[in-house]
Amino acid sequence: METPAGKRRRDSRTVRDYIRTIVDFPHEGILFRDVTTLFADARGFRMAVDQLLAAYAGEDIDKVVGLEARGFILGGAVAHQLSVGFVPIRKKGKLPGAVISQAYALEYGKAVMEIHDDALKPGERVLIVDDLLATGGTAAAGISLCGRLGAEVVGCAFVIELPELGGRALLEGLGHEVHALTAFEGA
């Protein structure tokens, strides 16, 4: 009888293999990289969380910051494994109480992200986590919000990177380390 552990050792799939591509969603010409299939598979989800953790082994991290919405799923799991707190950064109007806001550019227009004004303390070291790095606008807004509260961003971790959209260059240009588990060409 084969044990689950034995089965896992022989499975050669990568994180990328668990991500499905949906053509023409949400608009014609878009290849949507869907991580829900990764999250739904226990082995795939564990693999992604373990690889995100490995990238920051040895870093002193006080909190994990997750970007709405799939960053909450990943960030919560990473925070749990690190035994640190989790802080959500949400779209405008979704957090109760006192918040600070940061506008950022979208392809057509602007959006606003918010964080509770007491979510981070000066000097805390935080890891920002999200599922996807495209243009980097959302992550840059997250970096700004963390910085305005006095926290130090030790890195930005993503499952997927879409390299041709320039997000890595933006975040590295702001002086932040970027780690992505896989990259897909043809956004």
UniProtKB/Swiss-Prot annotation:
- Top-level class of the enzyme under EC nomenclature: transferase
Q: Which residues form a coiled coil?
A: none
**EC number assigned by the record:** 2.4.2.7
Q: Which GO terms describe its cellular component?
A: cytoplasm
| Gene that this polypeptide is encoded by | apt
Q: What is its main location?
A: cytoplasm
An example Gene Ontology molecular-function term: adenine phosphoribosyltransferase activity
Q: Pathway, per UniProt?
A: Purine metabolism; AMP biosynthesis via salvage pathway; AMP from adenine: step 1/1
Tell me which InterPro entries the record gives: Ade_phspho_trans (IPR005764), Adenine_PRTase (IPR050120), PRibTrfase_dom (IPR000836), PRTase-like (IPR029057)
* Superkingdom field: Bacteria
> What is the recorded name of this protein?
Adenine phosphoribosyltransferase
**Family assignment from sequence similarity:** Belongs to the purine/pyrimidine phosphoribosyltransferase family.
Physiological role: Catalyzes a salvage reaction resulting in the formation of AMP, that is energically less costly than de novo synthesis.
